[in-house]
């Protein structure tokens, strides 16, 4: 019996609808195939502390989809500390026309992400095994996103060299990070803050959008 059932498909479809994210049959199939890989590989690779497939739908898939409206601009995106691929893999599935780079320093996690790329045939997805400080792309990214990666201060400092004046930094957080905002480097500013309602997720979710000031 597959770990991914019609129940999970229904939960994904219902949650995406609540978020206002349009999922055609192919995108839903790819997201569920990704979920199946995450469940399978998590047993050996410890990709996420979430073990229950029901929780994975809400806390990983729907949480990733909650930022889709804020990631529509820009063609070249970086997911820093991608881990098990959230939100980078769902964004690559939702936006096949965009280029998504998934960066992580953990070899087990990048091996998993490479397998996801191959099995789901995600031609727009690139996996990079590197520490963020050592990563030197050819050009700045249009958007840089992180989910439970670091403090806002570290996120800004460690990725400063990866973006420019037009880049948007998207930081996915739980409770509103008031103390972290107080430590934000002077050359960064908060462009927008959004409280996110993720179907099936308990607790607060916030998205902070940052830009460089210099």
Curated annotation (Swiss-Prot):
One example GO MF annotation: rRNA (guanine-N7-)-methyltransferase activity
Catalysed reactions listed for this entry: guanosine(527) in 16S rRNA + S-adenosyl-L-methionine = N(7)-methylguanosine(527) in 16S rRNA + S-adenosyl-L-homocysteine
Compartments reported by the entry: Cytoplasm
Gene3D superfamilies: Vaccinia Virus protein VP39
EC number: 2.1.1.170
Keywords, comma-separated and alphabetical: Cytoplasm, Methyltransferase, rRNA processing, S-adenosyl-L-methionine, Transferase
One GO term describing the cellular component: cytosol
Protein's UniProt keywords contain Metal-binding: no
Binding, S-adenosyl-L-methionine: 81, 86, 132-133, 147
Main location: cytoplasm
A Pfam family hit: GidB
Function: Specifically methylates the N7 position of guanine in position 527 of 16S rRNA.
PANTHER family assigned: S-ADENOSYL-L-METHIONINE-DEPENDENT METHYLTRANSFERASES SUPERFAMILY PROTEIN (PTHR31760:SF0)
Family designation: Belongs to the methyltransferase superfamily. RNA methyltransferase RsmG family.
Record-linked HAMAP family: 16SrRNA_methyltr_G
Protein name: Ribosomal RNA small subunit methyltransferase G
Organism whose genome encodes this protein: Pseudomonas aeruginosa (strain ATCC 15692 / DSM 22644 / CIP 104116 / JCM 14847 / LMG 12228 / 1C / PRS 101 / PAO1)
Gene that encodes the chain: rsmG
